[in-house]
Amino acid sequence: MGVPKKRTSKMRRDRRRAANNNLRSAVQVTKCPNCKEPVMPHRACTSCGQYKGREVVAQAEA
């Protein structure tokens, strides 16, 4: 089994871990075409319950 000959410094360790931070992207938000509320892509709207022009979540009438 391979064993490291030298201890990994904090700087080298942190630099290696920081390399993956730029791969994460910010959360995408679009507008619902029906009610214009912000909604995440490929998900039903939480305010009107529609997805791709169809009502997929029944909303309670107030």
UniProtKB/Swiss-Prot annotation:
Residues 1-18 have a biased composition (Basic residues). Keywords: Ribonucleoprotein, Ribosomal protein. One of its GO terms (molecular function) is structural constituent of ribosome. One of its GO terms (cellular component) is large ribosomal subunit. InterPro entries: Ribosomal_bL32 (IPR002677), Ribosomal_bL32_bact (IPR044957), Ribosomal_zn-bd (IPR011332). Belongs to the bacterial ribosomal protein bL32 family. PANTHER family: 50S RIBOSOMAL PROTEIN L32 (PTHR35534), LARGE RIBOSOMAL SUBUNIT PROTEIN BL32 (PTHR35534:SF1). This is Large ribosomal subunit protein bL32. It comes from Myxococcus xanthus (strain DK1622).
